[in-house]
């Protein structure tokens, strides 16, 4: 076995949905832990998956022994050091006739991600192809944007760069859940002004169940958290128009969203707004004339 430092494992490719269970079953028997029911994201929901992320409920002190066990398994061909345990394994029942846009190699990357499986399934949830046109990351960015706007209380006093001296708001955390925080700028060590960093103090018990998260954010149910589309429909139903627009504008300006591509419906709405404003301006000119 070779050990690599982070990044994608060499020689791996997508796995077909029919190959996921046979591949994980082999590892389950050796590791004696449930892998199939702890897959994350879009694994098992789409025809092909680029890799397999699995939630691993394990104590931090037990991770070295788990890694040693993986190293001893012939099924683990390569391993990489990262914040997760990255491995390369052979795809069981590999069907070469099933192809996708990326090359299939007969091997797949499986990432073991230590943490709370229940919460990780909520955070890394990804809708199926029939439920959304967009990647699961859009859903998480939308939730994070909602957290930045909904029930946000900023102090009137600001620092030189425009940040409020204190802000109480929601935050979408991959480790802690939905948390209510008090955010303050971090002062420079010399006492002269502030750094670009913020200090986030959790002021309420973290929320980790989907229904409770939806309720805290003023939505109807866990189903509202399913996808970008369901979240957009939910905020349009439950929030004031000005807040909805602020959330959608913030979402569309997100760098990752722009890199992937702003959703078509937001482009259309923005064009309609521009045309409406242009029409209002034209009418104003006519009235002056």
Regions found by a protein language model. Name each.
Residues 1, 5, 258-289:
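Intrinsically disordered, compositionally biased, charge-dense segments
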Residues 1-39:
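Helical scaffold of the NTase/Pol beta-like nucleotidyltransferase catalytic core
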Residues 15-24, 64-70, 133-143:
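Well-ordered, non-membrane alpha-helical segments in soluble/globular domains
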Residues 24-64:
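Active-site nucleotide-donor binding segment shared across nucleotidyl transfer reactions
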Residues 31-40, 66-86, 153-161, 165-167:
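Short secondary-structure junctions
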Residues 71-120:
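Conserved catalytic core of two-metal-ion nucleotidyltransferases
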Residues 100-265:
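Catalytic cores of NTP-dependent nucleotidyl/adenyl transfer enzymes across multiple folds
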